[in-house]
């Protein structure tokens, strides 16, 4: 845990920040840089609440610098563009996802995989090129290089589309990369939560046969009837799990806490792939023999590059994919964090920044 010293920039900004490991978010005055020639400035309209926001404000991963303004599922309207910006114009709706910077010259960046760059700059909690701390979308305004700005499809809702900037790309990308996007592919989705319910929608749009695997029997009806999954497995029911052995081509595991992996490997066909997208606080135990039997693959992914994220947004708009959301006011965010940990949301919180961020607040500098 570290403390950052705020550098005064020309543009005043207002948001909600956590200041220590309690994770309590409160009003926070700060500043953002002036609009550079390749920069896009936007008024934030909506920002999704991601499980990683909770991890970061509590320093669960051990690298948080305070104060920290979370939020990397950001939708807004462009208010100013730099003199050399060509991608968008004032008045356009746009998105900012998990990244606001990378080296732009390494092999990963040149291959449109900015998220794999060793010098990636996260939307919040990272050091920007000018040495200042990045702050996220729990704020009234954002500025970013146009390369990291995403054009918002006209028919994609702003509020329920916002979580796609993390949950959408985090599930779309592995389905594409690991070859699990072919019609008829049998896909398992572990955990019917913020990531999981989007994974189901993405996989179904690709034409997959989807099995939801969850610890809660109460999720069965929603998985099958509302989200359109083809089957449901209660992973605490050994008979159900045994009956489904060697039935899946791939599994997208969205659970962000430690859990046994061996039962999931048993569900895979030979050459099957288990892809981890949840980020737990502690390392998993790896059941090596489960991998050896059947030449199975354990993989992982972390969001995606800018080109692929734009592709995902366009795909979502074409197939009418959005997140199931509960829109909340800014001052409800601490309660939302408490509910998030209890899985008491169906399935994603989205903060109505534009209508509920009271910038006249004088608290917390």
Curated annotation (Swiss-Prot):
It is found in: Cytoplasm. SUPFAM superfamilies: GroES-like, NAD(P)-binding Rossmann-fold domains. Its EC number is 1.1.1.255. Its cofactor is Zn(2+). Pfam families: ADH_N, ADH_zinc_N. Binds 2 Zn(2+) ions per subunit. CDD domains: CAD1 (cd05283). Zn(2+) 1 binds at residues 50, 72, 166. One of its GO terms (molecular function) is mannitol dehydrogenase activity. It catalyses: D-mannitol + NAD(+) = D-mannose + NADH + H(+). Belongs to the zinc-containing alcohol dehydrogenase family. This is Mannitol dehydrogenase. It comes from Apium graveolens.
């Amino acid at each position: 845990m570290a403390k950052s010293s705020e550098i005064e920039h020309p543009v005043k900004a207002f948001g909600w920040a956590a200041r220590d490991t309690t994770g309590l978010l409160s009003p926070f005055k700060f500043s953002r840089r002036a609009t550079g020639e390749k920069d896009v400035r936007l008024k934030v309209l909506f920002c999704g609440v991601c499980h990683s926001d909770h991890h970061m404000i509590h320093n669960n991963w051990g690298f948080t610098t305070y104060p920290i303004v979370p939020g990397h599922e950001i939708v807004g309207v462009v208010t100013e563009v730099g003199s050399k910006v060509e991608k968008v114009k004032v008045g356009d709706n746009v998105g900012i996802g998990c990244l606001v910077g990378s080296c732009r010259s390494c092999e990963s960046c040149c291959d449109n995989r900015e998220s794999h760059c060793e010098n990636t700059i996260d939307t919040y909690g990272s050091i920007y090129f000018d040495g200042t701390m990045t702050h996220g979308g729990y704020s009234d305004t954002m500025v970013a290089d146009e390369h990291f700005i995403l054009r918002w499809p006209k028919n994609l809702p702003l509020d329920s589309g916002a979580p796609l900037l993390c949950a959408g790309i985090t599930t779309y990308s592995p389905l594409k990369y690991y070859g699990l996007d072919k019609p008829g592919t049998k896909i398992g989705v572990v955990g019917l939560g913020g990531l999981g319910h989007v994974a189901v929608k993405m996989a179904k749009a690709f034409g997959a046969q989807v099995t939801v695997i969850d610890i809660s029997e109460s999720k069965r009806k929603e998985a099958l009837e509302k989200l359109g999954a083809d089957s449901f497995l209660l992973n605490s029911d050994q008979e159900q799990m045994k009956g489904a052995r060697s039935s899946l081509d791939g599994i997208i595991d969205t659970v962000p806490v430690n859990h046994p992996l061996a039962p999931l490997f048993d569900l895979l066909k030979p050459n099957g792939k288990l892809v981890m997208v949840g980020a737990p606080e502690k390392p998993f135990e790896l059941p090596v023999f489960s991998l050896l039997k059947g030449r199975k693959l354990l993989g992982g992914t972390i969001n995606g590059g800018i080109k692929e994220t734009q592709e995902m947004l366009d795909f979502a708009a074409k197939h009418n994919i959005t997140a199931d959301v509960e829109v909340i006011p800014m001052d409800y965010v601490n309660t939302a964090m408490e509910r998030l940990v209890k899985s008491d949301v169906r399935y994603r919180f989205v903060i109505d920044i534009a209508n509920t961020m009271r910038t006249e607040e004088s608290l917390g500098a």
